[in-house]
Amino acid sequence: MKNNNNELIDYMINDFKSGIKHGVLVANLTYELAQMCGLSKDEAYELKIAAMVHDVGKLKLSEYLYGRTDEALPEDEKQYMSMHSKISYDLLKKYDYNIMDVVLSHHECFDGSGYPNGLVGEQIPLGARILKVADEFAALISDRPYRKAFDIDTAVTIMIDEIKNMDIRVFLLFQRLIHEDSTIELINNSRLDIDDLDISDILKISQD
């Protein structure tokens, strides 16, 4: 039993570290993309906060998902996993941030096939549409338990195949963003091993 508990603790620690790396990358991409979409720096910074914490609900599910991957989950358990955006919203709403609807809606799809509310098109807050693009790209270029990270061009091709899920205007601006030298450097920094970073390194990577 002790060994099982230690394995679970190690899994949750690694899951937490992975979440930090993902959150930092998504936050930086969201901040830059938001300004390209015409938002002010203050509005973009609020979205950056949303992006940093958007998956906090997954921490509540870590023990349940121990040893599994999204690919391996049966359909009923994938539906359980899809609750994480609502859990994130519920955990954060007491802080009265302006970006709670963005956290709640970051898995909504432009064609109405997303969750938790099946919003369509511009019913989805602009911030959530921006965060969705950044979040999906960051996931594709990161290692997962069931696959290696895709390179940037392959990730973009996969996203084009799924364009019905996204606001195409946001996605076209994102395509411009990811070919800028500063964005490529940001992506490369995000791939550093978090064990080699201290908190000042993480803050440096995530600064404006």
Give the predicted meaning of each segment:
Residues K2-D208:
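Histidine- and acidic-residue-rich, metal-dependent catalytic cores
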